[in-house]
From Swiss-Prot:
Primary site of residence: cytoplasm
Gene: PRMT7
The protein's name: Protein arginine N-methyltransferase 7
EC supergroup of this enzyme: transferase
Xref: PANTHER family: PROTEIN ARGININE N-METHYLTRANSFERASE, PROTEIN ARGININE N-METHYLTRANSFERASE 7
Length: 689
């Protein structure tokens, strides 16, 4: 059965009704899941297996039957580990129906159908008793309910319920405990993801400084965790201010409380500096003695020889509400507060008067300035990138005249301020969301520009002459940046907006950027390929059914599409030269016909061709460009440096998805890329030769 779904098209800006198969949602969920990544996590799987064997052995050693409850079973892997370790019976709970169906097949295929019962329910709905889902309470609790923040997927309320209703008192738990660690650092780079720094503009009448509204300066930001591959953050980008300390632990073998609470740790700064960031990660002990340990610690804490790449568990960056000066040897107190699903931090000087406040509840951070709702963290980083801003200043200086009437089309951009300071006679900015309007009003007011720059709250196609005070636009500018964009080419919405406002443009209008180009390069990933690679067997268990399910869902939609990834976090090396494949001329309106290209790229280096990376370059003027992708190939090995503020598009080749073993190493890759100007979508196909 087909169903119609209303979707906003990020490239054309129009609302479209799309016919989708009724199974579309779950296919997309499977295709975009990290199941494969978890199955490839050898360290995790091995430690879980060791912990489960030890738990079953302890229960059997007491002369008891080993009854296992596995919550969030996924493929059934942990239940099969328990059954093969000698458990008498396992209850495997999985709420996602397609996954539960796959688990039933996998369990049967591996010969554990008589030892494992898959229950397709949320664990809080599972019943115990002669007529229940479980005959009796379990004495071994096995789960993998953790995310990068540990508790973000609801581990605490799930454990709390399980201890009350599903497991015996004094049960064994795998993992046995989790411990959260923190470290205080100063980092201009990471702080730039949460605060807007002053922007210096050299204008003809002297230096101007663009400042943030005080409301934004004092705003703690949004409560959502910033999870990144901290192992890709060079040590030169942060200064360690404290040793690593334990913030809190959770013992999963005892009743767990999910109610909000706070923890406090004393830190002795090892260096003076600005405390801005709390870096955090966790580890899990699979057994009570802590000998079987799985850790997320970053490279400067544990030796790289013990490093296991994983994408389903990373490390956390927390922004303190405001930066605090700390002095070496002068103690400070770090407070971690948590609710059921998230954690946040505050820092206090360790003075006596603060002791009485130790138990005071600290409210979860809430963005009141709205800028953190408009701009995500990479966008803050982009706006703070002085080199990038200089390119826009340089290009604006070359096109603006004293009589220029300027219109800016981008979401929450600083370009209108730059255009005004650089001499435009009049500046209009098109903001088509209430949030961006509100933020920009505050911004202009803080810089005494509320009477100098006019905000037009309208969609481009609804722009009227009266909005523009009956003036024609001589300079149309955009970064372009739009909050709805996920893939690099979605910002081509600027082209569609430019087309929609054509009647308001002067005949000799200057458009900046004047054009954009789609670029492409073939790469070998160090690790990212694993998220799309089949597993086959995992710790000796056949999970081919899972591979087939993911492949089927990828074929349903995703495998012929590129997906966004921030490649500064995922190292790769180039196997081909970067190549421009499509050009979009913003000086002209969007054409009626499709834009398409075919060709081939030669592979210059040996390596596994995992996929193609695609990105946009914007030609601001004839000789000034900004890239959203490749910044440079840093050495002869082909290691790449990527724009850290943007996600690049990755198209994985079928050789990754289907785990093909190529008899001959390919020497070239052919491509066919088509941009449908009506839908704004890019279709692509690649073949290895």
């Amino acid at each position: 059965m087909k169903t119609f779904c209303g979707r906003a098209n990020p490239t054309t800006g129009s609302l479209e009704w799309v016919e989708e198969d009724e199974d579309y949602d779950y296919h997309q969920e499977i295709a975009r899941s990290r199941y494969a990544d978890m199955l490839h996590d050898k360290d995790r799987n091995m430690k879980y297996y060791q912990g489960i064997r030890a738990a079953v052995s302890r229960v059997k050693g007491r002369g008891e039957k080993a009854i296992v409850l596995d919550i969030g079973t996924g493929t059934g892997l942990l239940s099969m580990m328990a059954a093969s370790a000698g458990a008498d019976f396992c209850y495997a709970v999985e709420v996602f129906k397609p996954m539960a169906n796959a688990a039933v097949k996998i369990v049967e295929k591996n010969g554990f159908g008589d030892k494992i019962k898959v229950i397709n329910k949320h664990s809080t709905e599972v019943t115990v008793g002669p007529d229940g889902d479980m005959q009796c309470r379990a004495n071994i609790l096995v789960t993998e309910l953790f995310d990068t923040e540990l508790i973000g997927e609801g581990a605490l309320p799930t454990y709390e319920h399980a201890h009350k209703y599903l497991v015996q008192e004094g049960c064994e738990a795998v993992p046995h405990r989790a411990t959260v660690y923190v470290q205080l650092v100063e980092s201009k780079r990471m702080w730039s993801w949460n605060k807007l720094f002053p922007v210096h503009v050299e204008a003809e009448d002297g230096e101007k400084i663009i400042v943030s509204p005080s409301e934004m300066e004092n705003c703690p930001g949004v409560p959502s965790v910033c999870d990144i591959q901290l192992n890709q953050m060079p040590s030169s980008d942060f200064t360690i201010l404290s040793d690593v300390v334990t913030m809190f632990s959770v013992d999963f073998s005892k009743p767990v409380r999910s109610a909000s609470t706070c923890y406090r740790a004393q830190l002795d700064p090892v260096k003076s500096g600005k405390a801005q960031i709390v870096l955090s990660w966790w580890d899990i002990d699979m057994d009570p003695s802590g000998t079987i340990n799985c850790t997320m610690a970053p490279y400067w804490v544990k030796p790289m020889s013990a490093f296991q790449w994983r994408d389903h568990w990373m490390q956390c960056v927390y922004f303190l509400p405001k930066e605090e000066q700390v002095l070496q040897g002068e103690k400070v107190h770090l407070t971690a507060c948590r609710d059921e699903y998230s954690v946040w931090y505050t820092l206090q000087k360790a003075r006596e008067e603060d002791e009485s406040k130790a138990d005071a509840r600290v409210e979860s951070p809430v963005c009141r300035c709205q800028a953190h709702l408009l701009w995500n963290r990479p966008r803050f980083g982009e706006l703070n990138d002085q080199n990038r801003t200089r390119q826009y200043i340089k290009s604006l200086m070359s096109v603006l005249r004293t009589d220029s009437v300027c219109l800016c089309i981008s979401d929450g951009s600083l370009l209108p301020v730059l255009a005004h300071y650089l001499g435009a006679e009049q500046v209009f900015t098109l903001e088509n969301s209430a949030v961006s309007c509100s933020v920009m009003k505050k911004f202009f007011k803080a810089n005494h520009l509320e009477d100098k720059i006019k905000i037009v709250e309208a969609r481009p196609e609804l722009l009227t002459s009266s909005h523009l005070e009956e003036k024609k636009i001589s300079v149309l500018v955009g970064e372009p940046f739009f909050t709805t964009s996920l893939l690099p080419w979605h910002n081509l919405y600027f082209w569609y907006a430019r087309t929609a406002v054509t009647e308001h443009l002067a005949s000799d209008v200057t458009v900046l950027p004047q054009s954009a180009a789609l670029h492409m390069m073939i790469v070998e990933f160090q690790d990212l390929w694993r998220i799309r690679s089949p597993c086959g067997t995992c710790e000796g268990f056949d999970v081919q059914t899972m591979d087939d399910m993911i492949k089927n869902s990828l074929n349903f939609r995703e495998s012929k599409e590129a997906e966004p990834h921030p490649l500064w976090e995922y190292p790769c090396k180039s196997l081909s030269n970067p190549q421009e494949v499509l050009l979009f001329d913003f000086r002209k309106t969007v054409p009626q016909h499709c834009l398409s290209t075919e060709g081939s790229v030669n592979l210059l280096r040996k390596g596994k061709s995992h996929g193609a990376v695609l990105w946009m370059e914007y030609h601001l003027t004839a000789d000034i460009s900004v890239s959203t992708g490749l910044m440079q190939i840093s050495n002869e090995k082909g290691n790449c440096e990527w724009n850290p503020h943007c996600k690049q598009a990755v198209y994985f080749f079928s050789s990754v998805i289907e785990s093909e073993t190529l008899a001959d190493v390919p020497t070239a890759v052919t491509y066919a890329i088509k941009f449908d100007t009506k839908t704004g979508e890019i279709a692509m196909d690649f073949k290895l030769l």
